[in-house]
């Protein structure tokens, strides 16, 4: 499953991304949430408001300040115990980087929030 949430800045992409993550968390699927936002701590309470429970067992937020940092941790995430990989704030991926990231997911669910349009 690959879901790309696209839109302009301020159109609620991250909120929609969190809503989809909450749906998976309610199903007791493990979610890793990789973001460029330093204030990601608040996302846990948002997920709980959306009905997600047991976050300490199923939810792992991670901060990577830029694309290079994200690509460095991507192999670690890909081999971790996660059912869903959510990416927030990495809108400068080109098609090749996007394709590489998809290969690293090992056929897990991927949700990307971005203002970028991809050809795949």
Q: How should these model regions be labeled?
A:
Residues 30, 83-84:
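The start of beta-strands in P-loop NTPase/AAA+ ATPase cores
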Residues 1, 54, 75, 81:
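Short, basic/glycine-rich phosphate-binding loops at helix/coil junctions
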Residues 6, 86-87:
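A short, structure-level motif marking secondary-structure boundaries and short turns
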